[in-house]
């Protein structure tokens, strides 16, 4: 598969992507564990009238939990409803899970990468990380960038600018806690430091540089995942440039410059 063919394949994944399904909520502490546990007990929990009681959240939050569990590839559609995915079981299961309560930053880095793995339940995330090259930006400017990028795909071009605006606002709030809110309503992904405040406090910037909490093994896993999803199985080699600058590459997802990525691979 050539680079051009790879881009075509990625474009097809973008075309099938979803927008605005998070109901304006970034993932909160405990939500993913709550969602996968509920699905393990009842595959149709998200359709149940008493889901708000069982999950202990509002109706819109029920839909948001469902969307984030799908976006992070923690649940998958089964014959009779949703079931925990292999990743969901291995990461969050009570008995054998690697990190059931997401206490290790490595787990958050692994989950963040899932947003760049098809299918895209939250397609604005890869659009933002791939196409926002501004030194700093606000939510309206980020909305314009992902909206313009979405116009290349007919299914995304039909989505209203208002939905893109909600996605842009959610992206920033997921990785940057401007108001220093209570931890119960803060996104755990703030810990990754992918978005920082700029000198102008009303604007933010992507943190492009070394990520002190990103384990080399997680970066390596993302590289293998990228190769598996986006490159031909006949390819025996891949350039460092493609791993860093290719659409939906680990370098793009983790905002790593080439020199830093080389250090991780060494």
Where are the model-predicted features located?
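Donor-sugar nucleotide-binding helix/loop cap in glycosyltransferases
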Residues: 2-4, 8-266
């Amino acid at each position: 598969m050539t680079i051009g063919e790879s881009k075509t394949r990625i474009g097809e994944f973008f075309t099938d992507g979803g927008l605005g399904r998070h109901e304006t909520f970034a993932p909160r502490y405990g939500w993913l564990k709550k969602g996968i546990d509920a699905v393990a007990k009842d595959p149709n929990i998200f359709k149940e009238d008493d889901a708000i009681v069982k999950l202990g959240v509002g109706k819109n939050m029920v839909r948001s939990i469902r969307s984030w569990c799908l976006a992070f590839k923690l649940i998958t559609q089964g014959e009779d409803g949703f079931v925990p995915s292999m990743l969901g079981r291995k990461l969050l299961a009570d008995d054998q899970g690697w990190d059931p309560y997401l206490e290790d930053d490595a787990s958050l880095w692994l989950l963040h990468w899932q947003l760049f793995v098809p299918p895209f339940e939250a397609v604005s995330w890869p659009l933002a990380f791939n196409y926002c090259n501004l030194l700093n930006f606000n939510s309206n400017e980020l909305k314009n960038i992902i909206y313009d990028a979405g116009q290349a795909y007919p299914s995304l071009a039909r989505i209203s600018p208002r939905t893109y605006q909600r996605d842009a606002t959610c992206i920033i709030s997921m990785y940057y806690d401007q108001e220093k809110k209570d931890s119960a309503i803060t996104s755990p992904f703030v810990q990754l430091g992918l978005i920082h405040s700029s000198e102008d406090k009303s604007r933010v910037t992507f943190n492009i540089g070394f990520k002190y909490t990103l384990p080399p093994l997680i970066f390596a896993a993302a590289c293998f995942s990228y190769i598996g999803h986006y490159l031909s199985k006949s390819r025996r080699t891949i350039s460092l440039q493609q791993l860093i600058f290719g659409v939906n590459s680990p370098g793009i997802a983790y905002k790593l410059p080439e020199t830093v990525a080389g250090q991780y691979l060494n």
